[in-house]
Swiss-Prot record:
Keyword presence, Nuclease: yes
Enzyme Commission number, as recorded: 3.1.13.-
Origin species: Buchnera aphidicola subsp. Cinara cedri (strain Cc)
GO cellular component: cytosol
Quaternary structure (record): Homodimer.
Protein name, as recorded: Ribonuclease T
Transmembrane segments: none
Keyword tRNA processing: yes
Cleavable signal peptide: none
Sequence positions that bind Mg(2+) 1: D24
């Protein structure tokens, strides 16, 4: 294996100035504008000097359903969340997003990126809920790209021929406990490991950096 010493392996160079943040949202339905957001977790990422993507920090919040939101019985039965259980320690959408956006902006600045980009499994769902919640609480200087995402379901379908998170993780060599599935924190962590493996596997196979055959090679350190 080789690395290319003349390549800029900073994360901002790898993703065109975007900073990837892995997110999972659990909700009380599928309609982002009307159904309650119940739980959210994020995992930030970092890239080492050789260009390998790794997990960094994490945040996790249970969310109080916003006023007037719809809670669909079949959805909470599926994710096993009792929205009104006081032991959840739930906070408002505004409180959760304020802390999440603060951390993401910090990571964007540290890594000299321009904007955050959401990474999720079936990313359209999580992106819609995040943007709807951000709008409800007055945006709070939302650091995420308004429409571009990285979808690990699509990427896993390409690389592994599987779009189900548990099956993709298994093929990637990542443990997956189905008893913990649909916990926002657990799913976010496993999705983060999966995304890192997808990115790193592409690098191991020679797909990154692109068009690098002309570059000066040196033994990997």
């Amino acid at each position: 294996m080789f690395i290319y010493k003349d390549i800029n392996y900073a994360i901002n160079n790898r993703f065109r100035g975007f900073y990837p943040v892995v997110i999972d949202i659990e909700s009380a339905g599928f309609q982002a504008d009307t159904d309650a957001l119940l739980e959210i977790a994020i995992v930030t990422l970092k890239m080492n000097k050789s260009g390998w993507l790794k997990i960094d920090d994490r945040l996790h919040f249970h969310i109080i359903p916003f006023k007037g939101s719809i809670i669909k019985a079949e959805s909470v039965a599926f994710n096993k969340i009792d929205p009104f259980n006081p032991l959840r320690g739930a906070v408002s959408e505004k409180n959760a997003l304020k802390n999440i956006f603060k951390l993401v902006r910090k990571k964007i600045n540290i890594n000299k990126c321009r904007k955050g980009i959401l990474v999720a499994h079936n990313a359209n769902f999580d992106h819609n809920f995040l943007m709807a919640a951000s709008k409800r609480v007055g945006n709070l200087n939302n650091p995420f790209h308004p429409f571009t995402t990285f979808d690990t379901a699509a990427l896993s379908g390409l690389i592994f021929g599987q779009t189900v998170l548990a099956k993709a993780c298994k093929l990637a060599g990542i443990p997956f406990d189905t008893n913990q599935a649909h916990s926002a924190l657990y799913d976010t962590i496993q999705t983060a490991y999966l995304f890192c493996e997808l990115v790193n596997r592409w690098k191991r196979l020679g797909g990154w950096p692109p068009n690098s055959s002309h570059r000066k090679k040196t033994d990997e350190i």
